[in-house]
Amino acid sequence: DVPKDARRMHKKPIPRLGGLAIYGGFLCSILIFGQLDETMLCVLLGAAIIVALGIFDDVLALGAKLKFVVQIVAAAIPVCIGDLQIGLFTNLNPLSDTPFVHLGILAVPATIIWIVGITNAVNLIDGLDGLAVGVSSIAAITMLAVALLTGNMPIAITMAALAGACIGFMPYNLNPAKIFMGDTGSTFLGYMLATVSIMGLFKFYAVISFAVPFLILGLPIFDTANAIIRRVAAGR
């Protein structure tokens, strides 16, 4: 990453394909220790597409529309093929006797929006050294703890692999950063956190499903909303 303006925190060129190290570390761990059912294989396929897109974007600077379309495709794979969907969530209306709200035909688009939204949310906070990988580490460790407490070992193994990859990369990304994760790493982390949060929380523990992912990923979600508002206000 070559600093081209005064807004850049770094003054010297810094490699920005560090996300490949995160992805490689995670993939090795999950292939050795993970439990690869159809849903997880679909998630890994979608993640591979996200990583490939990130590499091309880091090297060639792809257009936003193309990236958005590819991200939708990557999100649709586990949703449509792996049956990874937000089918219901807790009804927060105190006047209603219905404990859950069923999304029905809206489950597929709602889940794709969730995955693409969180993928880009983590990408947008990757502006300061160590911020995105730090937030992702905290989110992964929190999901790991929830999975262990609820006895969901496949999710626990997945989150342990993701947290380990993040923590291993973190010393090289803290200020002053020696390497950046680039879009390759940030979008991969966002994609994995978004998909696994559905697998581990939404489908099996509906009571905490809506609250926990938003609490864990609150910083990138609100940062994304703030960035969108600022860009719209500035006419960009």
PLM regions and their residue ranges:
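C-terminal ends of transmembrane helices
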Residues: 1, 50-63, 116-129, 167-180
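Hydrophobic, well-ordered secondary-structure scaffolds
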Residues: 98-141
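N-terminal transmembrane signal-anchor/hairpin module of polytopic inner-membrane proteins
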Residues: 1-106, 110, 207-236
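Alpha-helical transmembrane segments
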Residues: 23-52, 93, 131-236
